[in-house]
Amino acid sequence: MRTLIGADQRTSGKIILKGKEVKNGWNTTKALKAGIGLLPEDRKTQGFMNLSNNYENIAISSLEKYMTGPFTDTKKKIKNAEVYFEEMDVHPRRVDYMTSNMSGGNQQKVILARWMSTDVDIIIFDEPTKGVDVGAKAEIYRLMEQLVEDGKSIIVVSSELPEAMGIS
């Protein structure tokens, strides 16, 4: 999955995106511009910046939206994060809180808010409910359904058979 977003280089095979083969040099910046996001299996080491708060973790993949001259508009990042926290039922509702101090389910919601804020076309969910409680699972499933209803494409990788059957 990480190869699809350019985090790892491919060693064999082809990646075809919108009918065109992705050539060597594929990286995360190009994947983002192509409209691909990833909710990684290991959110703690690959999903968010451990030393950053929630609003920074949501904004990191779309900083151009927050630029005012050479700086980013912190108030705009905070307001954006607050909208997603409300929509996604994130607790605690503190956008200035460190993402690493949140529960697993709420960390997943912060990462998903990043991709929803970035407005990617394809989101890859790699073990999306690994290590999250039942309530957070239900909310993540609801958000996945909402993305599909909004015309987004999702790819789900799950080792949980009931989850895979329920999503398909």
Predicted region positions:
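Glycine-rich phosphate-binding loops of nucleotide-dependent enzymes
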Residues: M1-S168
